[in-house]
């Protein structure tokens, strides 16, 4: 398997999300932080649903977590993930049992839109 780099955007569109005030809907209001937290919560839900992860999957999990945290701290709108880590992230979104809502839908669109897939 090739180990290409996949690019994941952290610019989540918050327009039209109920329960958010106007300040939070502005493009610069930590959209990357919100997107990163949603992605990390989905990964946690996936891991909990499986009652833990294998060592190989934990390494991918930590890689994605650390990459997202660094991107938020550095105010990056896009992150690069190795194809293995990106595949693991997509698996988390596919297999985790989640309650559908509009903001999750938008986060799923970011993951589905990773360049290179």
Give names to the regions the model predicted:
Residues 1-117:
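Positively charged, low-complexity terminal tracts
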């Amino acid at each position: 398997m090739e180990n290409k780099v996949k690019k994941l955007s952290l610019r989540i569109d918050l327009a039209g999300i109920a329960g958010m005030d106007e300040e939070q809907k502005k493009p610069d209001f930590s959209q990357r932080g919100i997107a990163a937290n949603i992605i990390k919560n989905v990964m946690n839900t996936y891991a909990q649903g499986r009652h833990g992860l294998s060592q190989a999957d934990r390494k991918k999990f930590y890689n994605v977590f650390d990459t997202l945290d660094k991107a938020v701290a550095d105010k990056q709108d896009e992150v690069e993930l190795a194809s293995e880590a990106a595949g693991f992230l997509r698996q988390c979104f596919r297999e985790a049992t989640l309650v559908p809502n509009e903001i999750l839908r938008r986060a799923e669109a970011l993951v589905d839109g990773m360049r290179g897939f």
